[in-house]
Amino acid sequence: VQTCALPISNMLSVAERHKYILDHLNKYGFVRITDVANELGVTKVTIRKDVKILEAKGLLYKVHGSARSANPHVADTDVHVKGNVNREEKERIARKAVELLNDNDSIIMASGSTIYAFAEAIKREFRSHLNVVTTFLKTSVLLNDVEEINVVQLGGCVHKKSLSAIGGYAEAALSDFSCSKLFFGVDGIDLEHGITTSTIEEAKLTQVMMRSASKIIILADSSKFGQRGFGRICSLEEIDVIVTEIGRASCRER
């Protein structure tokens, strides 16, 4: 007697497929179209149609090749509030990022809660000479206490939520520096929309920072993937390294 396994899809109606997708979103917050198609034994075209219907009903948000249960467009949020989100993950990412530093490095550090966690890790763990150029007031104050670190605080208008100097003064000053590495955080990493942040001003400033550094490094926790900010910084192809956490903190180098 021969037996065969029938695909789950043979037993699922459209409504049941939709429930399957929504149940996974409620549990994990994120699903890949390819994974759902394989699990249900249907084509990716079928799942894309299902996702499109569910998005039209306001039940999920479609991003490139996947769907999320939350709106992928992020708002400008106070840096102190961000600091309490995924704190342990950011600390692990920060410790991994310290491993990328070399003695006598000259680096640019942007603003953000993950960058501040990086600054804290530098103060605890890095014992060599370092030159730091930053727009972030909190980083300047923290690292200025370290004997081996020279801090250059860039001027400009202080953005109230990010505590970062922004605008023409900061951008003009950056042109005077040639640094080995840029470390910056982001609000969104998306295959289709690239690297984004929540404001146009921060995006423009980061673009100028990129032109003043040889190696471009993003520090981002897992919540930033599939998200989109209002201001586009660059494409993924322009990034050299992403330090993130998938199970544990790791470096993904292009």
Where are these regions (language model features)?
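Conserved phosphate- and dinucleotide-binding cores of soluble alpha/beta proteins
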Residues: 10-25, 30-36, 41-43, 55-56, ...
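HTH-adjacent hinge/linker in prokaryotic transcriptional regulators
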Residues: 10-34, 38-40, 45-111, 120-127, ...
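Amphipathic, non-transmembrane alpha-helical secondary structure
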Residues: 95-98, 102, 116, 120, ...
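Catalytic core of membrane glycerolipid acyltransferases/transacylases, capturing the structured
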Residues: 121-141
